[in-house]
Amino acid sequence: MKRIITFILAIIGSVSIYAQEKSRLTDALKYIEDGRFIVIVEETTDIKTQSNRTMHSTRVEVKGDIGSMIWGSSDKIISNNHWNDNAVDKQAKVTTSRKKPSSIAIEIDNAFNRGYRIECNIDTDGKCSGMIYYYNEVFCIYKGRIVDLNE
């Protein structure tokens, strides 16, 4: 009898976890499919890397299949073709992963700013978290919230 009750509780638990994950996934996919949102970074942990890169990210912006990252004390933006104050022009490509559908990555691959990658994991309540890489080095871990640009 104990085994049957344990088995039933395990099934109920797994169904509940599946429902929560499906809900999380649906919200994340809504943001990704709409393709217009800003991640307002609320908390960061800067990590000193071997190449001595530390930067404080303040905002990640996604519009369709392009994305950008604004950071630093003077809101510098790293984009696809230049790095200057408050500029949002042609930004890096936004990609999604089949393994992690609630996650996006923004990859910047041009001669001047090559190697930067932002990963963003989206939760149900509009919260998100992620890491910013320079090539394979993590130099910033962040938590934030999403603002939908369509509203």
Model-derived segments and their meaning:
Residues M1-L25:
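Bacterial Sec-dependent N-terminal signal peptides
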Residues A10-G13, G67, G130, G144:
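Small side chains
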Residues E21-R53:
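Tryptophan-anchored aromatic micro-motifs
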Residues S23-D27, N52-G64, I70, S97-R98, ...:
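Extracellular/luminal recognition modules and glycoprotein regions
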Residues L29, D75-S102, F112-R114, I146-E151:
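Exposed acidic/polar residues on beta-strands and adjacent loops within beta-sheet cores, strongest
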Residues S51-A92, G130-Y133:
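N-terminal glycine/threonine-rich, aromatic-flanked beta-hairpin/loop signature
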Residues K99-E151:
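Beta-sheet ligand-binding and adhesion/scaffold domains
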